[in-house]
Each structure stands twice: as C-alpha cells, then as structure tokens.
Amino acid sequence: HLKGALALKKDHRKAVTLGQGKTLGMLFFNPSLRTRLSTQKAGRLLGMEVVVMNFGSEGWQLEFGDGVVMDGGKAEHIKEAAAVLSQYCDVIAVRSFAELKNQAQDQADIVLNGFLKYAGVPIVNMESAAGHPLQALADAMTIEEHKKRAQPKIVLTWAPHPRALPQAVPNSFVEMMQLMGGPTAIAHPKGYALNPELTRGIPIYHNQEEALEDADFVYVKNWSASDPYGAVLNTDPSWMVNLDKLGSAQMMHCLPVRRNVVVADDVLDSAQSLVLHQANNRTYSALYVLHQILQH
C-alpha cells in the first residue's frame, strides 16, 4: 500500500475521472480539520461529489444496540440510518472518537462497526474509537520520503496534555511501526500501556531518554491512561519533547499539537519537524484509499 500511495501522489492527474458520478458521504460525530479537508480534497481530485454532515450536531442521535426499546433520547437506529445513507452515497466515511469511559466498548468500535454491518457500500475510517489508519498511512509515507537509511529507528513517545485523549492515533501508528520493520521503541509513564496485542515485540521504556537513543524518527503523542482507563494520571512537563532530547532525529506529530506542552517551539519551528509534511500526506493517503475503493 505504501508504494501504491507514493506512486499515486506523484501521478494522480489520470485518476481525475475515476469518481465521476459517484458520491462520497462524510459523517462527523467529532471535530476535524485535517481529516475533513484532506478527505474532501481527495474525493474531489478523483472527480467525486462530496457531501459532509456533522452528525453529532445535525443528525438524529443514533442507537447502535440490537433489540433496544427506543424510548429514550435516541431517535434513529443504525439499521435505518446506514441503509438510507447507502442509497445516497457510493462510499461513506465516518469519524467517531472513543468515549474513554469503557475500554472494551471503545475497542469494539461500535459506531464504525455499526456502519460496516448495516451499510451496503464501502466504509472509510476517518478515525474511530480504536484506530486512525488514514493518519498511519500518511505517517508511513512521510517516513519513507524522509528516511536517511534503509531501516530507521522509529520511536513513539508519550507526552503530557491537560485533557484525556484517545489511543486511536498511537494504536494505528504502532501497527504501522510493526509493518515498517527496523528498530522500534515506545516510551510512556507507568499506567499508559497501549493494547498489548498491538505492541507485542516492541521494547517499552518508562525512561524517555533511553528510548530516544539513536532515534531517526520520534513520533510524539499524548494518550490517556489504560489503568484506570481514560484517566489523566500524569502531566509531568519533563516528558515534553524539545530539541535537546530530539538530538538529530526528525519529529512527527499528527496535529493539532499544544506548543510548549507536548512539543517545544524550538522543535516545531525547526527543519526537524515533519508535521506539515504529514498533514500534506493526509490528502494522498485518503486519495489512495478512495482510489482503491473506486477501482474495485
């Protein structure tokens, strides 16, 4: 997929008619900047009509449970909603964050899987409770374009944040690290372990400096605790990434980033920051996924 995405980025002009007469429906249960605009742009580059709905504020509240007596606040069941949307759209893209209340429920990805189960058209994940694959593909493209050796060392490090954030981005980045090969490491304080099925085989450090040793790429990201799930256990500013810690490595972050909390100004304003390259590649990761769907 990585080679295909990079090739399409270089030469996508020929694909401008592939999506003609097709409609991409984008449903947002949560806020978005990069995902929303890059996926819209990708659809348009393929000639698709793009319709966007902020489902959280504009749609009916959806029920996802089977056999529920719907006498509460939820007005429509996913069965009807997904079936109706499938009549209007040839591809449906969905963004729905983790609620960070119940780990098993978030890992079950109820909203995304509800659409997968009841829609009659392909579904694109624009960040779900458990993962953000469009971001991970853009990240892989960015690493491939900027690596200085065949098997660079890739490190994922936790950094502090005042709010509880989902584990979706780190989950997908870890899956991508496993596929890239080469040396890897993950650094986080105690209590912040990611899904052990995803991190299997990757060295885990509670000492950030040790993990960052000889790193080529440092991916900085906050996520909330695993035990107790969804909590903010630690806001230790010494975990913030600055140029001293980064050394000669290149820094990555999915954005939005809180300056001087997660990453210092001196890093974000330096040539070692790849965040704008990552954001640019968001268009091309979405383009590749939509291109694959339209071709098949």
Model regions and ranges:
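Positively charged, low-complexity intrinsically disordered leader regions
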Residues: 1-37, 41
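Phosphate-coordination loops involved in phosphoryl transfer and adenosine-cofactor binding
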Residues: 18-24, 151-153, 248
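Glycine-rich phosphate/diphosphate-binding loop of Rossmann-like nucleotide-binding domains
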Residues: 29-51, 144-220
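Anion-binding alpha/beta catalytic cores of soluble intermediary-metabolism enzymes, centered on
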Residues: 74, 79-83, 90-176, 253
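A short helix->loop->beta-strand "cap" motif at the edges of active sites that frequently abuts
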Residues: 119-121, 182, 244-250
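Rossmann-like adenosine-cofactor binding region
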Residues: 198-273
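C-terminal helix-to-coil terminal segments
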Residues: 269-296
